[in-house]
Amino acid sequence: MAIQNADKTNFKELISEDFVIADFYGTTCVPCKLFSKILEDIEAEIPFLNIIKLNTTENPEIAAEYGITAVPTIHFYKDGKLVDSHVGVMQPQAVKDV
């Protein structure tokens, strides 16, 4: 499944799908760009994985609602429930281990 961009109109719907990795990022954040490449590589390796990205600059209300205070922040959801989170860039194996 391709990496999907989320916004306030579809975020809650997207995180309700089975297991989802949500990447909260900022437009000018250099570490976010590095992590984006890591997610692209993981998606290529595991194409059935649900990965969504939410731009916190363009969607500050969603970022506030989910307690995002720094980027990148990665949330892991199972059937809409937060099961794990991480602030900062994660190494590929750490993402896969969740």
Walk through the language-model features, giving the residues of each.
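N-terminal leader/targeting and pre-domain segments
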Residues: 1-18
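Thiol-based oxidoreductase modules, predominantly thioredoxin-like and allied folds used
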Residues: 4-6, 24, 36-61, 68
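Short acidic active-site motifs
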Residues: 10-11, 58-62, 94
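Conserved hydrophobic/aromatic "anchor" residues
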Residues: 11, 24-25, 66, 77
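Short active-site neighborhood of thiol/selenol oxidoreductases, capturing the structured segment around
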Residues: 15-27
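Short cysteine clusters
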Residues: 29-32
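Structural micro-motif
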Residues: 66-75, 93
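Non-catalytic, surface beta->alpha helical segment in thiol-disulfide oxidoreductase systems
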Residues: 76-98
